[in-house]
From Swiss-Prot:
Catalysed transformations (reactions): a fatty acyl-[ACP] + phosphate = an acyl phosphate + holo-[ACP]
Signal peptide stretch: none
Protein name: Phosphate acyltransferase
GO cellular component: cytoplasm
Pathway: Lipid metabolism; phospholipid metabolism
Subunit structure: Homodimer. Probably interacts with PlsY.
Primary location: cytoplasm
Subcellular location: Cytoplasm
Length: 336
């Protein structure tokens, strides 16, 4: 198998490079064909990778970057004021063919702005969209947009649907069911943009558009791809993650009660642990920026080692599936 090379913005995120380096090393150990390039302050990164096996160290490169983009920094500042940031250098490695994907836990707005500047969008795409896998009763659905585009036109939503369908196919869904997230399933429901997008999708060639889906239908697994603007999508994503965390905490509190509750908890806990693990946000961490001429994965800034590993694994899958090239080929057929 040919090598996969991923550039990691090692300085991004809420907790600095320690978790990022630990996740990188774990992914190297699990995937012999993987090569990683850590971008950041060399002295700091060299200390963190010291002591690794010779085999892992041979597949781990460090590239210097003298600047770091803050999590609360304006994207315009990142574009103009920090040409040697770890985020930008990692993206330039992808642009120059020295890496096949970039993973960052840094500032979302800055990452999107720099990705569009450095990598450019695919022909026919006005705006990239953030997409991630959401657990459902039937498995997973791809939800987009997750916050990159707060205000969207009907044409934007149409393009998101096309990109989401291709991404779902790359992840193994034969004929993805595509739906628009709405406040009802009837044709009369929704705002003007959603209604116009529905009209465009109903006439799309080669797209399995099934109509509107409500929030509860999303979790029942009624669609494989669910499309919405970034304002709605980000609220839905954060609410889902908060709900999953709250349910896990409430269950643990419940089973720490009296003797009977503890006995019931002892019997049920293995199954509940499996459920918690399946719904844990860390397991589904890693949102893809679809529509770029290169692979970019955004991790939660607060992600721990497991979550960062999930983001790197998503990048690996998209490399193996040649996702940007597949998108480019399908967009010519599906875009008006």
């Amino acid at each position: 198998m040919s090598a996969q090379i991923i550039a990691i913005d090692a300085m991004g995120g809420d907790f600095g490079p320690r978790n990022i380096v630990q996740a990188s090393i774990a992914c190297l150990s699990a995937t012999p064909s993987l090569h990683l390039t850590l971008v950041g302050q060399p002295s700091l990164l060299e200390d963190l990778v010291s002591g690794q096996s010779a085999a892992d160290r041979a597949r781990l490169q460090i590239v210097a970057a003298s600047e770091v983009i803050g999590m609360d920094e304006r994207p315009s500042q990142a574009l103009r004021g920090k040409p040697d940031s770890s985020m930008r250098v990692a993206l330039e490695l992808v642009r120059d063919g020295k890496a096949q994907a970039c993973v960052s836990a840094g500032n979302t707005g800055a990452l999107m702005a720099l990705s569009r500047l450095v990598l450019k969008t695919l022909p026919g795409i006005d705006r990239p969209a953030m997409v991630a896998a959401i657990p459902t009763q039937a498995g997973y659905c791809q939800l987009l947009d997750l916050g990159a585009n707060v205000d969207c036109s009907a044409e934007n939503l149409y393009q998101f649907a096309v990109m989401g369908s291709v991404a779902a196919q790359a992840l193994g869904v034969h004929r993805p069911r595509v739906a628009l997230l709405n406040i009802g399933t009837e044709d009369i429901k929704g705002n003007q943009q959603v209604k116009l997008a529905a009209s465009l999708l109903q006439n799309a060639r080669g797209l399995n558009y099934i109509g509107f889906v409500e929030g509860d239908g999303l979790y029942r697994g009624e669609a494989d791809v669910v499309v919405c603007d970034g304002f709605v999508g980000n609220i839905l994503l954060k609410s889902s993650e908060g709900l999953a965390t709250m349910i896990g905490a409430r269950i643990e509190t419940l089973f720490r009660g009296g003797l009977l509750a503890r006995a019931a908890g002892a019997m049920a806990m293995p199954l509940l642990r499996r459920l918690q693990a399946d719904l844990a946000p860390a397991r589904h961490n890693g949102a893809s920026f679809l529509g770029l001429q290169g692979i970019v994965i955004k991790s939660h800034g607060s992600a721990g080692v497991q979550g960062l590993q999930s983001a790197i694994q998503r990048a690996l899958i998209e490399i193996q599936e040649n996702l940007p090239q597949r998108l480019h080929g399908r967009l010519e057929d599906l875009l008006p």
